[in-house]
């Protein structure tokens, strides 16, 4: 019996939620073999990569998901958050501006903007000095 892409995606999500990461990855990749730009499979595989500290692997997956469906706010959030985690601050700011232009929820973007600010703040030298 042939399964539809949606059925395979649901199986992947179920495996992912159950912590069966290898099975989830296999299922997401099986979708991407026949539908390389599938937004949910790319996004979910990116989320999986982030969960095992493979941020660099997640970035192109999130970007592909976003290019395939720029209306999904979660795709914007995931991509910007991954850029911040990867210390790509300039790129994160650029994508954040694009998200605002697309009408992504301001509260969500404000949270990411705070994360960006925290990453770019210079440490206070007084706090770095050893106590006398």
Model regions: which residues?
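Short, charge-rich amphipathic alpha-helical segments embedded
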Residues: 29-51
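Structural signature of tandem alpha-helical TPR/SEL1-like repeats
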Residues: 2-6, 11-30, 51-64, 86-98, ...
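Structural marker of alpha-solenoid helical repeat scaffolds
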Residues: 34, 68, 85, 101-102
């Amino acid at each position: 019996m042939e399964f539809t892409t949606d059925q395979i995606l649901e199986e992947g999500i179920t495996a992912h939620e159950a912590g069966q990461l290898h099975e989830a990855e296999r299922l997401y990749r099986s979708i991407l073999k026949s539908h390389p730009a599938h937004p949910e499979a790319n996004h979910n595989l990116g989320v999986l990569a982030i969960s095992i500290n493979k941020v660099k692997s997640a970035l192109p997956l999130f970007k592909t998901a976003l290019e395939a469906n720029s209306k999904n706010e979660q795709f914007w959030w995931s991509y910007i958050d991954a850029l911040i985690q990867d210390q790509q601050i300039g790129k994160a700011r650029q994508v954040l501006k694009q998200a605002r232009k697309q009408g992504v929820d301001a509260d969500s973007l404000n949270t990411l903007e705070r994360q960006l600010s925290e990453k770019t703040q210079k440490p206070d030298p007084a706090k770095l000095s050893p106590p006398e």
